[in-house]
Each structure stands twice: as structure tokens, then as C-alpha cells.
């Protein structure tokens, strides 16, 4: 059994770690609330854009944009949204498992895959396992801006327009609630027609100045809005997962401290009992 001094040293060490994890939990909780506000603020725009584009995909347009055209899938692109930092449980692991599973399914059909990776955790993964990374973005921080994403998004859009990729997906973590975050895999291109009955009764549009000019701009803005929404939502998931992970770490540290206190008390009791026995034994010998 370890000495009382050694056990007290371990207790002090775990208490110090608990203070750190507790502080990180509180910071993550604060950041999560701010990230949720950004996510909630951007959702109506992204949702409305998706609805408008779904109507367009259902419509009989005089100009059929390349983003609306289905073609044989030989190359698949993924925009993978991960985090820059760890200590957020299995958030990135589950996300990357989803990407690998989807990519493997396409590769089994004979398609090639390429990636645009957001976040250093995703980049570390693809450096480790390999993968055709066409673009990457790191260091977005806790307040990502659309301007930081546009360049990398354009790389994938240009690849789609040139025929280098035939289908484009975005994979990010969906914020279900504070306790639950799940990977979400959405097809960005070609744009899918809406399946709702309301969307099938699509609107008739009048295009100003012309369908081509309008759609060229609108559809790019739509893709950018969906990627930005994914990044903002993934950031909220990251903070929620980190808060939960740090709370679990703090709780575990508390359990360890209690166990060590019991061990320390037993060691102290044993030492006192031994001293009493020695005194009694010495007195009896006299």
C-alpha cells in the first residue's frame, strides 16, 4: 500500500486536474450558448434558400443550370466539417466514420473521391489515412465567417462545373440538442428537387435581368449558405460535446478523489493501529 504522503500527492494532483476540467466545462457552456445564437440566426436564411432552390429544381426552366443537371457519377466530392480542437468526446470520430462509410460505398461502385476539409482534426485524419484533399480550411475559431470559406467552396464548385466531380456532399454534425449531436450527410450538387407536395405545386418565376445571370448568382449563394450553416452548427455541436466531456471528466475526477480519500484513511488507520500495537507490545515486554 502506498504511503499517506504519496496518496495525498495523488489527491492534490487530481484536484488540480478537476479545477481545470471544471473551468473548461464552464467556458464551453458559455461558448455553446453563443454558437447556438449564431446557428439559430443563420437557420431561417439557409432554410428559405433551400426551399427556393427546391422549387427551382422542380420547375421547367428555360435555362437549366449545370448545378441542376444529373449525370453519371464517376467522381464524388465531400466538404467535411470537423473541429480545430479536441477534448470534445467522439464528435470528430463519429463524423469521420460517416465520411469513410459514404466514400467507401461510392468507391465500391467505381467512383473516385476527393475532399475539402474544414478543421485541423479532419486534416490530421486524412494525412494519417490518405485521401485526395483538394482544399482545406483551419483556424476558423469560435466565430466563423463566410468570407473565410468562400475560397475553398469555390474549389469544389469549379471542380463540379468542369466535370472533375459529379456529385458533392457536405458532412457535418447536426445539433439535435445539448446532449445529442449526430453526423449529417447532405447532397449539395446536383441540387435535388423538393419531394413535398407543396413544392411540387411550384411557383412560376419571372427572372430579372435574365434566368442565367440570376441562377448563376443565386445557386452559388445557396451552396455558400448551406456550407456556412453546416460550419456554424458544427461549432455549436463542438462546444456542447466539449461541455459534456469536461463535465464527465470532472465527475470522474471527483470519484477518483473520493476513492483516494478512502485509501488514505485506511492507510492512516493502519499506521495508527500499528503504532498502538507497538506501544502495547513494548509495555507488555516491560
UniProtKB/Swiss-Prot annotation:
Task: List where this protein forms a coiled coil.
Answer: none
InterPro entries associated with the record: ATP_synth_F1_ATPase_gsu (IPR035968), ATP_synth_F1_gsu (IPR000131), ATP_synth_F1_gsu_CS (IPR023632)
Where it sits in the cell: the answer is:
Cell inner membrane
Task: For this UniProt record, give its keywords in alphabetical order, as a comma-separated list.
Answer: ATP synthesis, Cell inner membrane, Cell membrane, CF(1), Hydrogen ion transport, Ion transport, Membrane, Transport
- Predominant localisation class: membrane
Molecular function GO labels? ATP binding; proton-transporting ATP synthase activity, rotational mechanism
Respond yes or no to whether keyword Membrane is given for this record: yes
CDD domains per the record?
F1-ATPase_gamma
Q: Which PROSITE patterns match?
A: ATPASE_GAMMA
Q: How does it assemble?
A: F-type ATPases have 2 components, CF(1) - the catalytic core - and CF(0) - the membrane proton channel. CF(1) has five subunits: alpha(3), beta(3), gamma(1), delta(1), epsilon(1). CF(0) has three main subunits: a, b and c.
What protein does this entry describe? ATP synthase gamma chain
Tell me the organism's taxonomic lineage. Answer: Bacteria, Pseudomonadati, Pseudomonadota, Gammaproteobacteria, Oceanospirillales
Record gene name: atpG
